[in-house]
Amino acid sequence: KAFAGVRSWTAGDKEDEQMSGPVAPKDPEKDRSYFYIMKEKETFGSLQTQGEYQGRGVQFIYESDGRLESSAEVTGEVCDEEILKKLGTVEGFKSLVHSIGISVEMEHSREPVTFVFQMYGKEDLYGGGTLIETELRGDGAEVRITLDTVKWKTDDDVPGQIRFVFETPEQSARVNVRFFLKDGFFVPKPQEERVVDMESHGYQEMIERSLLSMGDAGRIRRVVEKARAGEPVTIAYIGGSITQGAGAVPLHTQCYAYRFWKAFAGKYGKNNNVKLIKAGVGGTPSELGMIRFERDVLRDGKEKPDLVVVEFAVNDEGDETKGRCYESLVTKILSMPDAPAVLLLFAVFANDWNLQERLAPVGERYQLPMVSIRDAVTPQFRQTKDRVVSKNQFFYDAFHPTNLGHKIMADCLMYLIDRAVCEPDICLLYTSPSPRDSTS
């Protein structure tokens, strides 16, 4: 396994020693069409306490169950249905992809990083598939794996997962992975993305679109007054994997829940009087919300939240009650003796989908403040000249936001709070559904 790049050389080395580096090819590499499945993707090598990678840091990125196709669609802007379909199986992948380009950039640039692309097997799911593996350094130089050199296994079924393995755990890195295509396949050259200008008029307009309804903001204002007075205030969140922090790197300090809490405390709190309770659990719907609220937020009566953010707009697709469990959770929080403020947050998937049309009427019925991330970001995704943030910049994968996406979500929540404080009489009512509804 060869490192990419040239090693350092100092006067202490032997004078006749040759500097090592990559071997120059006899002929230039053919200019091939390509697309990214990861582009400037933020990763974090979590410490592994057991197993094969014990003592090292690993970032797992799952690509099965349509995730690889979604990555090609969102990050690579691939629209060709034939190409997307081929990514669903190992046989299709082999017929499409000529080589894989990988680069990693991190602070410890000379430290080795191992890239692993694991195929899942038909008979032996995790042990029967091919492992495509190479070692590179964190200096940003691209290493390319040509698939003709890979020894494929007969049990291969579908592309399974990608792993970045770091010798030193708990460090962040930005990674790029792109697929170079075989002759006969073509995709348009990727567009260069602009840096997101958070001070721009366009960014502010995007944030403003998130305010779906102010509702009756009296409880919100009471929370702010309490915080300003230096009294203890608790902000709690209940939701799914986005509230847990999925897609944020590192998860606990870059997620929207932490960012909003920090912004609120910095602007309205005094002497660390604002507390955070984050009860996000991946894959859980509001049907479990009643139980989880008692256990994870109230902590069996030990906690009394002043503001509760409820985020289940992308978790309740399988809810057989069609929103009744969600409404029961909302009314349970509203009817608590301490009368906490309730804020409904509607996140969004990369295909522009959420359950806003089903759940927003609950907020309207009880005159609750509501924030729609879908309304904020999806209209500008389709723009070219005036686009503020691309899907690749906003989404970590098909379901979860990047650090930037989490930042935008936090900014949307803060915008509602600021409007409630500055304009107490405002009441923006929920009106018409957006083009993508819950049945799409």
Descriptions of predicted regions:
Residues S20-G138, C255-K275, T284, L288-C427:
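Alpha-helical cap/lid subdomain in secreted, periplasmic
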Residues Y430-D437:
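Conserved small/polar residues in nucleotide/adenosyl-binding loops
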Residues S440:
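Hard-cation-handling environments
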Residues V143-F180, G184:
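Extracellular beta-strand ligand-recognition surfaces/modules
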Residues F180-S213:
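Helix-enriched interaction subdomains in cytosolic or periplasmic regions
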Residues Y203-A279, R292-K304:
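Serine-esterase "nucleophile elbow" of acetyl-processing enzymes
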